[in-house]
C-alpha cells in the first residue's frame, strides 16, 4: 500500500499504532479493499512521491473496509458530493503497525530483482496506491527489508 510520507508515513503509523486508510479515490483499489483484504492480512507500507521511494515496513489489516468518512466531509480534500451514507462510494481498511524495515527496499532494488519481474509497481503507467503481491514477492520484500 503506497502513501506519500508527507501525508502519512510509516513513522506516523508507528506512533498511532493503527490508522484508517482514508482518501483513496480509485474504484479498482476500493474494490480490492472491499473484496480481497481481510482481517489478519499483512501489507507492505511503501513510501511514494518522495526522495527515498520504496518499501519501508509491514502492517496488518485489523478491520475490513468500511466507508471512508472523509467522503462526507465538505471541508475535506477527499469530499465526494455524490456519495451518501446510504450509498457510500469510498471505503478503506484499518491497519496496524507491525514493523519498520531496517533497510528501505528501494524501487530500483525492486526493479533489479527477478522476483518482482511481473509486479504492477514496476510496469509503466501504474498509478494504483494498492498493488497485489504474491506470497513469494511479499516474503522477498520482508527479507530485503531486514
Describe each region flagged by the PLM.
Residues 44-45, 60:
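Hydrophobic beta-strand signal
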Residues 12-13, 71, 106-108, 141-144:
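A short secondary-structure junction signal
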Residues 57-128:
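Aromatic- and Lys/Arg-enriched surface recognition patch
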Residues 2-8, 54-55, 74, 78:
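A cross-family signal for N-terminal binding/gating loops and helix N-caps
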Residues 1-39, 137-138, 145-146:
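Compositionally biased, charged N-terminal/linker segments
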Residues 46-53:
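Short, charged beta-turn/beta-strand-edge "cap" motif at the junction between a beta-strand
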Amino acid at each position: 500500500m503506497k502513501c506519500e510520507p508527507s501525508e502519512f508515513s510509516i513513522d506516523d503509523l508507528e506512533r498511532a499504532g493503527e490508522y484508517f486508510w482514508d482518501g483513496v479515490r480509485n474504484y479498482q483499489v476500493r474494490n480490492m479493499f472491499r473484496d480481497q483484504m481481510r482481517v489478519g492480512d499483512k501489507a507492505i507500507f511503501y513510501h511514494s512521491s518522495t526522495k527515498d521511494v520504496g518499501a519501508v515496513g509491514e502492517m496488518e489489516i485489523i478491520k475490513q473496509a468500511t466507508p471512508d468518512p472523509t467522503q462526507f466531509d465538505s471541508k475535506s480534500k477527499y469530499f465526494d458530493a455524490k456519495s451518501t451514507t446510504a450509498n457510500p462510494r469510498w471505503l478503506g481498511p484499518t491497519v496496524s503497525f507491525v514493523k519498520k524495515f531496517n533497510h528501505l527496499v528501494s524501487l530500483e532494488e525492486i526493479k533489479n530483482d527477478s522476483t518482482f519481474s511481473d509486479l504492477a509497481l514496476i510496469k509503466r503507467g501504474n498509478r494504483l496506491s494498492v498493488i497485489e503481491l504474491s506470497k513469494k514477492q511479499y516474503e522477498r520484500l520482508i527479507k530485503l527489508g531486514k
